[in-house]
Amino acid sequence: MSDENLLTTLDTYLASGIHIGTQQKTEDMRRFIYRVRADGLYVLDVRKTDERLRLAAKFLSNYEPEDIMAVTRRVYSVGPLKKFGQVTGINTVAGRFVPGTLTNPSAKKFAEPEVLFLSDPRVDKQALKEAIEIGIPVVGMCDTEHLTAHIDFIIPTNNKGRKSVSLMYYLIAREYMKNRGLIGEEVPFSYDDFLEKAMNVKVKMNTAPRQRGRFQRRPRR
């Protein structure tokens, strides 16, 4: 596979791990899978990811930034998503999605977007549920194990890694801005700007020792 016609170099795609899936797959995602490794890990087709990413950015560019809502609850996506919103002007919800945001006019942060952009259809299930309820199209980053029945536009990708999600948000932001004529070949932001936001995230680990003897097995009768 050459770099010709790709949105970035093949080396950049591979280094980001954008093609690394999981050890589960669904029939919905089968068409985007390139192969399965000896360890059972499914590998996504980079060229198909590039193609869908390009088309997704083109689709989103039909909408004004204020008419798009981009959502994520994934820890490593929060920083890159905020950067995505900063450079594009697109509305973002990074972190908990408050129930009723799209369906309850009395909600404090009620919004009426025309399209929803998700980082993960399973993790962002509340936002997806409400988008379905109000009937707006949904663009979603989907890994090999996802069900996609309610995703109108699938972007097959590793949506869990710091590097991969940073690259996705960077490329979509860049192409969205280009398609709308807001930037030219000189891009005022970089992949590293997005990656920096992801790398600064520190995940708290639960180091408390487990309490033994709290739960006891009942004798069989």
From Swiss-Prot:
Q: Which PROSITE patterns match?
A: RIBOSOMAL_S2_2
Family the UniProt entry places it in: Belongs to the universal ribosomal protein uS2 family.
Q: Which UniProt keywords apply?
A: Ribonucleoprotein, Ribosomal protein
What organism does this protein naturally occur in? Answer: Methanococcus maripaludis (strain C6 / ATCC BAA-1332)
Q: Which domain of life is it from?
A: Archaea
In the UniProt record, does the keyword Amino-acid biosynthesis occur? no
Instruction: Name any one GO molecular function.
Output: structural constituent of ribosome
Against Pfam families, the record matches this protein to: Ribosomal_S2
* SUPFAM superfamilies the UniProt entry points to: Ribosomal protein S2
User: Which segments cross the bilayer?
Assistant: none
Q: What is this protein called?
A: Small ribosomal subunit protein uS2
**Biological process per Gene Ontology, one example term:** translation
> Is Membrane one of the keywords UniProt gives this record?
no
